[in-house]
Amino acid sequence: MHGSNKLPGFATRAIHHGYDPQDHGGALVPPVYQTATFTFPTVEYGAACFAGEQAGHFYSRISNPTLNLLEARMASLEGGEAGLALASGMGAITSTLWTLLRPGDEVLLGNTLYGCTFAFLHHGIGEFGVKLRHVDMADLQALEAAMTPATRVIYFESPANPNMHMADIAGVAKIARKHGATVVVDNTYCTPYLQRPLELGADLVVHSATKYLSGHGDITAGIVVGSQALVDRIRLQGLKDMTGAVLSPHDAALLMRGIKTLNLRMDRHCANAQVLAEFLARQPQVELIHYPGLASFPQYTLARQQMSQPGGMIAFELKGGIGAGRRFMNALQLFSRAVSLGDAESLAQHPASMTHSSYTPEERAHYGISEGLVRLSVGLEDIDDLLADVQQALKASA
């Protein structure tokens, strides 16, 4: 950029990477190519595009200039060769796993997963001959012991939704390379501003870009980043032929607008969450708190090794179980009772009855999701107002 070979900083790339206004009539903001199809100057040119011999667009389910800019920008931020934009986080996850797995293959999974990911695996792809096993991705000995010749993919979230359990990403990647398995990491909670799994050895990163990347709660979107070869496979197999989960150009433009302020928003999310977590840790109504920024967090050292900041998500368990959790939730006034996360607004949800309702009670207990667990997505409001709301809700929960 500007004649320098030095890689620009994160914020600079989030705003400028891959776009030159002079290539687009001087437009400061990238144009939106709101078109389904593209014309060819000749039949021969079109044939070359279809054969992959000529760079070009022919149908927006496969590629679109607006989406391609978003994809290049996300690849730069994650430190990957290529990116792929999709219609939702589940579009990204399903397109990726349908591409990588075949009947008879095995996928090793983190113990705790987002509820819809869990449902897709256990009630979707798992019914087509793909073997599923859950492993603690922080226990590298257990992971090594679980590997078999059929293991094709290792998939996990770090931190995990909703209990914040972390994986040793570099350690997992080292084991996977030895066995020829592909490592896929859901980096939604962190974004590339806080954690870059590809730099730790992962092969692919997936995001629900609906969350922090967008940051405004007004679109659904998904992202995949990895090597050019893997991303091309997912584009031409998982997206084009299997899910069709294409992101609209308009939503891609909104997502790029959100990414421009990602670093500023994440700094604020993290700062607010740290103060709120420290407050919760002192409250008599709280049985247990899960937040990577607290020294009491069991994986505090690992968090400091692979994350630059502890993030904006907090999970905690109230004394009194599910009844206390419901009373707390219903008493909130500033926090909104809603699924999703990463918005400017602070959100609260009860996993047992919301995002992880696809788990049985026994599965939730097995994977560390108690009936009284509350998850907070700490927003950008003034911290004093957030503290006051949580304090009065805690009193109501007792």
Swiss-Prot record:
The recombinant MGL protein cloned form P.putida has been found to have antitumor efficacy in vitro and in vivo. PEGylated MGL is being developed as a cancer drug. The keyword Transmembrane does not apply. InterPro entries: Cys/Met-Metab_PyrdxlP-dep_enz, Cys_met_metab_PP, L-Met_gamma_lys, PyrdxlP-dep_Trfase, PyrdxlP-dep_Trfase_major, PyrdxlP-dep_Trfase_small. The modification N6-(pyridoxal phosphate)lysine is found at K211. Substrate binds at Y114, R375. Changing K240M: 50% reduction in alpha,gamma-elimination activity against DL-homocysteine, while retaining elimination activity against L-methionine and L-cysteine. It comes from the Bacteria. Its EC number is 4.4.1.11, 4.4.1.2. Induction: Is under the control of the positive transcriptional regulator MdeR. Forms part of an operon with mdeB. Pyridoxal 5'-phosphate binds at Y59, S60, R61, G89, M90, S208, A209, T210. GO terms for molecular function: homocysteine desulfhydrase activity; methionine gamma-lyase activity; pyridoxal phosphate binding. Keywords: Lyase, Pyridoxal phosphate. The keyword 4Fe-4S does not apply. Irreversibly inactivated by DL-propargylglycine. GO terms for cellular component: cytoplasm. Its cofactor is pyridoxal 5'-phosphate. It catalyses: L-methionine + H2O = methanethiol + 2-oxobutanoate + NH4(+); L-homocysteine + H2O = 2-oxobutanoate + hydrogen sulfide + NH4(+) + H(+). One of its GO terms (biological process) is transsulfuration. CDD domains: CGS_like (cd00614). Belongs to the trans-sulfuration enzymes family. L-methionine gamma-lyase subfamily. Catalyzes the alpha,gamma-elimination of L-methionine to produce methanethiol, 2-oxobutanoate and ammonia. Is involved in L-methionine catabolism. In fact, shows a multicatalytic function since it also catalyzes gamma-replacement of L-methionine with thiol compounds, alpha,gamma-elimination and gamma-replacement reactions of L-homocysteine and its S-substituted derivatives, O-substituted-L-homoserines and DL-selenomethionine, and, to a lesser extent, alpha,beta-elimination and beta-replacement reactions of L-cysteine, S-methyl-L-cysteine, and O-acetyl-L-serine. Homotetramer; dimer of active dimers. This is L-methionine gamma-lyase. The gene is mdeA.
